[in-house]
Every structure is written in C-alpha cells, then in structure tokens.
C-alpha cells in the first residue's frame, strides 16, 4: 500500500508513498504533492460531503443513506489514537487521545441529513455520549430497550447508545437495520470487535436489547 508513519517530516519514505499513490491513481509520478495529487488525496473526504437527493426519504432514511456514504470511504484514524483528517472532520478540528469521536461521527451524519431536508436537528451536534443522552432524555427522546416489546419503536436511522454504567454511556452509532432483536449499525471510532475506542467507521451487528 501507500501507508507510511506520520512523523511530521516529508522524508524519503513519504516521497516513495506519494509516488506509489500517484501511480495507483494514474497521476504523474513525481513524489511531489501538487494540486492534482492533493485533490486526489482529499477525494474520499470530499465524497462523503456530497449532497444526497432526498426524494421522498424521511430524516431517518436519509441519515442511513449518508451513513452508508461515509462507510463506503472507510474513514480511519491516521497518526495516532483519535487522530487524522477524518477525526478532525467529525470533531470540528479536534483530535487526540482525549477526543473519542463516535458521537462526533453519528451527529455529523445526522446533521448532514437535517441540512439536506432543511429541518432542525432532533439531537445536538455533540462530541460526548453522556451529553447526547442527557439532551435526548430532556427532550423525551431516550428510548430504553430492556424488553422485546420496547424494540417496536426502534427504526433505521435512530441513534443508539451503549451503556457504561447505570448513569453513563460509552459509545454511540447509527441504526442501519433491525431484525429479530438484532441491530445492524454503522459506527465511528470502533472496529470489528466492537470497541468504543476503535480506529474506523464500520458496519457492526449488535443485540438490540439493553441499549
């Protein structure tokens, strides 16, 4: 691949990585990040920001559509825990170990859908699970799924929270589908094992109960 260690120095390894990237994308191979190469490097981030025609889609349906648009570009951390251009996009420029970005991702996607439909956000754009849970509870939008009967109200496009303690939450994502008490989700700051401190946006399968 084209990956190399991010150390803040444009050295020989970075130059070779740029040359590989240019070759793979059928650009002039120079090892120099010119404007054409920069545009190609940033194209995945540009792609997730393209507007989706809403048609007759509801806010929930459009939220799922935007989440899939992000998933297709496979956003990942680069240069350390909770670091890189994707994290900065979702976190309004913030990055670093102290900035988990699952909430930033979920509410950034929700905001995209709201702006497309020109409607107010049902939840604030936020960086913390606890603050989102508190806002949802105050607005009487926090649904507790302790029994199978509770799941009848859950729809694709909803945000879900993973509980840490009785009074706090540690992770959030977007419900893509729900079938037979099982959620298919699209989440940021996770990985295939379901970590709340993962490194990517990915699709996961989770129990729908006790969320």
Regions found by a protein language model. Give the residues of each.
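Low-complexity, Gly/Ser/Thr/Pro-rich intrinsically disordered linker/tail segments
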Residues: 198-211
């Amino acid at each position: 691949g084209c990956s190399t260690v991010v150390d803040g120095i444009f050295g020989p390894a970075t130059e070779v990585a740029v040359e590989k990237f240019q070759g793979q994308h059928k650009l002039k191979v120079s090892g120099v990040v010119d404007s054409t190469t920069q545009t190609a490097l940033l194209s995945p981030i540009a792609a997730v920001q393209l507007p989706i025609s809403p048609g007759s889609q509801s806010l929930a349906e459009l939220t799922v559509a935007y989440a899939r648009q992000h998933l297709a570009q496979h956003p990942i951390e680069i240069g350390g825990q909770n670091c890189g251009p994707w994290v900065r996009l979702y976190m309004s420029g913030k990055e670093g170990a102290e900035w988990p970005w699952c909430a930033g991702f979920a509410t950034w996607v929700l905001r995209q859908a709201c702006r497309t439909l020109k409607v107010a956000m049902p939840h604030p754009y936020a960086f913390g699970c606890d603050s989102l849970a508190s806002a949802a509870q105050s607005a009487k939008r926090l649904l507790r799924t302790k029994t199978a009967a509770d799941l009848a109200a859950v729809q694709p496009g909803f945000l879900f929270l993973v509980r840490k303690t009785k009074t706090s939450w540690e992770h959030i994502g977007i419900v893509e589908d729900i079938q037979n008490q099982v959620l298919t989700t699209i989440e940021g700051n996770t990985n295939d094992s379901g970590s709340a401190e993962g490194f990517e946006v990915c699709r996961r399968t989770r129990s729908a109960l006790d969320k």
